[in-house]
Amino acid sequence: MSLAAKTLAVTGAAVLASTLAPAPAQAATGYARCPANRMCVFSGTNGTGVIGIFATGDDNLGDATGPRGLDNNIESVWNRRNEYWGLWNNAGYTGGITEVTPHAKGNIAAKYRNLTTSLKNIRA
């Protein structure tokens, strides 16, 4: 192999190596966004859409202090805590809708979707 061919081969290998950088890590999607030991609610089915992450709850998802886009807009949950959670139709934990058992993950029954305004842990 001539010197020019060797130089071209080495240069080509160096260019190829520089373009094969590792791909950046992908951001978590769906239910995988829910951290351990938290109650997570999602605006879409199957853990899609806006996520709300809770340790103790929120007495009014419609006010300015909580996550945006979840008031009367929760379709799926993942309860990663060792306690039951209550979902309520009104602010201040009134107008009960349903309970979420410890470690439950999935879509809320159709008749209870898009009704929740407050939620909190209710018992271990």
Model-derived features with residue positions:
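Compact beta-sheet-dominated domain cores in extracellular/mature segments
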Residues: S2-A124
